[in-house]
């Protein structure tokens, strides 16, 4: 397994380009299954999960044309079968997103129960229940979700018991081709959900209310082709901004948007960062100062994102004062804290809250990534620490960050990949 070797205590300084959002690209790639004509998806990040989703479509017989800029043209009508096998689904939870489009467009689907990051129980029962309300006949057997429908799905009024991003996306895609009106209540409001809705609208779907807790979808008979560019990755944007703040540096991130990152930018300003923004860029400057500790509570969008708490935990570890981080979205999301403690962080865990007292500096150590965002926090810790840090199991990082060591090198970091 590859590792990252980081030599710390250098403030980051420079400019980088932000990649397309993986969490928007995956549902949009799944949505191409709904169209009768080719759909081209642009601004895709070069990531393992994207490759897996493209491979999954290819395994089903879907014809794909990929250019050198990672734009993909998808011809869903060439599909041969409707089976998403365990060996692909186990590596990526988002494979469940093909369930709704397959049932809605082709009347059947067989999708393995998902795998992915080891952060708590993320149930798929809301997807299944919603599709059943729309008339799908679903059995779960031998580790597979097997769904069928006679004719078109029917619009339904669906209340989601908990806010679920992939559940909202799956049901919104299915409803786009259903007969009649579907209302999704307690829907996820994340920018990636909005981006999927905008792509579906570009394909001819009739959707209103995306970005609010109530989405209304009037089903249409068919969806046509379109060309759609995926929105920028707000978590990648936030990660590089926090890395610069934690090291007392300056960074300008380009090809991104501030409007999808407001909760994070407010916390960075609270930590003492000077932030300026333009139409497609954000600049952060710590002016050489040590960050101030911040307290935060994660919750679904537009509140503070769970995918950014690990990075702030790393920053708090060397900040002035102490801060409390409360995780309300997922259990098991503090696995990185033990590794930070091994590097000298002063952290007390109380249930779903972590109290972090800033220390003058961390010390480099061998550490191990446990999930995608935890691994980003360990990289940030390594950038701040005295001496060398080796981050193991970085396949987690490669699932969510495109060329992380190359982008950090552009910002002046001493970081390199050690091949297995």
From Swiss-Prot:
The gene is murA. It comes from the Bacteria. Belongs to the EPSP synthase family. MurA subfamily. Cell wall formation. Adds enolpyruvyl to UDP-N-acetylglucosamine. Phosphoenolpyruvate binds at residues 22-23. Its EC number is 2.5.1.7. HAMAP family: MurA. PANTHER family: UDP-N-ACETYLGLUCOSAMINE 1-CARBOXYVINYLTRANSFERASE. GO terms for biological process: cell division; cell wall organization; peptidoglycan biosynthetic process; regulation of cell shape; UDP-N-acetylgalactosamine biosynthetic process. Keywords: Cell cycle, Cell division, Cell shape, Cell wall biogenesis/degradation, Cytoplasm, Peptidoglycan synthesis, Pyruvate, Transferase. The active site is at residue 117. GO terms for molecular function: UDP-N-acetylglucosamine 1-carboxyvinyltransferase activity. This is UDP-N-acetylglucosamine 1-carboxyvinyltransferase. UDP-N-acetyl-alpha-D-glucosamine binds at residues 93, 307, 329. Gene3D superfamilies: Enolpyruvate transferase domain. The modification 2-(S-cysteinyl)pyruvic acid O-phosphothioketal is found at residue 117. InterPro entries: Enolpyruvate_Tfrase_dom, Enolpyruvate_Tfrase_sf, MurA_subfamily, RNA3'P_cycl/enolpyr_Trfase_a/b, UDP_GlcNAc_COvinyl_MurA.
